């Protein structure tokens, strides 16, 4: 870098500008995806329903699937309300 370009400033090349923009977009999408509910949860809930209903009669409302974020971990929580065996 020359002394003159230090004061005037260099014009960034379009490739480096595009790369910076892409990095910002990717970081934004990744952070947004973590905050929202994963898109596989409804399918997971239906598949659990299909497997469990082979053995026990339950309704779809009896299965709750949730993802919680704790620090750097994602916890998948599955709650299944089984009918009384009486």
Curated annotation (Swiss-Prot):
Q: Which InterPro entries match?
A: MinE (IPR005527), MinE_sf (IPR036707)
* A Pfam short name: MinE
Q: Name one GO biological process term.
A: cell division
Keyword terms of this UniProt record: Cell cycle, Cell division
Instruction: Determine the domain of life of the protein's source.
Output: Bacteria
| Stated family | Belongs to the MinE family.
Its biological purpose: Prevents the cell division inhibition by proteins MinC and MinD at internal division sites while permitting inhibition at polar sites. This ensures cell division at the proper site by restricting the formation of a division septum at the midpoint of the long axis of the cell.
Q: What is this protein called?
A: Cell division topological specificity factor
Organism encoding this protein: Albidiferax ferrireducens (strain ATCC BAA-621 / DSM 15236 / T118) (Rhodoferax ferrireducens)
Q: What is the lineage of its organism?
A: Bacteria, Pseudomonadati, Pseudomonadota, Betaproteobacteria, Burkholderiales
């Amino acid at each position: 870098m020359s002394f003159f370009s230090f004061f005037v400033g260099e014009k960034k090349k379009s490739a480096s500008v595009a790369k910076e923009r892409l990095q910002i977009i990717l970081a934004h999408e990744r952070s947004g995806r973590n905050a929202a509910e994963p898109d596989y949860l409804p399918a997971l809930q239906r598949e659990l329903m299909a497997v469990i209903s082979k053995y026990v009669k339950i309704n779809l409302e009896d299965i709750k699937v949730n993802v919680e974020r704790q620090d750097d971990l994602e916890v998948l929580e599955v709650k299944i309300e089984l009918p009384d065996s009486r």
